């Protein structure tokens, strides 16, 4: 029963990490980190991502333009690019390492401790990937709120608001964190049954000489 529960925990943790990694990649390239709705022209909406700005018009559709210079971007967008790339890389490494630590993958009975360490390392990498995804998303959201409520900006000036990519990034980061927690919990729970099994084998070995001689065990 414990083995089935541990295997299920490993599978769910790996799937959550995979889901968070995929959503993190989508968040990185989705041009909807910020949305701007013009009151004067409701048929035209602006969106901004880490790589480009887009205008959506009912007659023309979506037209996007890449940013000309990386150094000309605001600080939060420059750092967000780096952190999102780092999150994607850490997430991929976490999935790769965790996959080799699963119980369903047989790499030898003598390497149980190695698999446990791989599972723990994969969980830590998923944690790091989730944190590095949450930081840029939360930073951009914080700057958006600050600019929205800035009293120095006149009321008639349009304000940027939260885009869909921010919510997707939050969900991706939480999925990676939860997946890493499950992987580490599964790795920690896999150590106790193993030690208990070694104790049972050792106890049987101490009783075997008495059974072969036909004498009673003095511990009974």
From Swiss-Prot:
Membrane topology according to the record: Multi-pass membrane protein
UniProt record similarity statement: Belongs to the claudin family.
GO molecular function annotation: structural molecule activity
Signal peptide boundaries: none
Transmembrane annotation, as ranges: 11-31, 82-102, 118-138, 162-182
InterPro entries: Claudin, Claudin_CS, PMP22/EMP/MP20/Claudin
Domain of life: Eukaryota
Cytoplasmic side: 1-10, 103-117, 183-220
GO annotation, biological process: bicellular tight junction assembly; cell adhesion
UniProt keyword list: Cell junction, Cell membrane, Membrane, Tight junction, Transmembrane, Transmembrane helix
Protein name per UniProt: Claudin-24
Compartment(s) where it occurs, according to its Swiss-Prot or TrEMBL record: Cell junction, Tight junction; Cell membrane
A GO term from the CC aspect: bicellular tight junction
């Amino acid at each position: 029963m414990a083995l089935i529960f541990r295997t299920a925990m490993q599978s769910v943790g790996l799937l959550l990490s995979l889901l968070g990694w995929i959503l993190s990649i989508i968040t990185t390239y989705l041009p909807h980190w910020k949305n701007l709705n013009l009151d004067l022209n409701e048929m035209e909406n602006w969106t901004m991502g880490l790589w480009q700005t887009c205008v959506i018009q009912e007659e023309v559709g979506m037209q996007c333009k890449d940013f000309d210079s990386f150094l000309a971007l605001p600080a939060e967008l420059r750092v967000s690019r780096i952190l999102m790339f780092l999150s994607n890389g850490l997430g991929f490494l976490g999935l790769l390492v965790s996959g080799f630590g699963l119980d369903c993958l047989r790499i030898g009975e003598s390497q149980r401790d190695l698999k446990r360490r791989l599972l723990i390392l994969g969980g830590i990498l998923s944690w790091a990937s989730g944190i590095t995804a949450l930081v840029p998303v939360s930073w951009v959201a914080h700057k958006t709120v600050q600019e929205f409520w800035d009293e120095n900006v006149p009321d008639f000036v349009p304000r940027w608001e939260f885009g869909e990519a921010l919510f997707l990034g939050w969900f991706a980061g939480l999925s990676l964190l939860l997946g890493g927690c499950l992987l580490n919990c599964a790795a920690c729970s896999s150590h106790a049954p193993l030690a208990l099994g070694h104790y049972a084998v050792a106890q049987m070995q101490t009783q075997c000489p008495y059974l072969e001689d036909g004498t009673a065990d003095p511990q009974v």
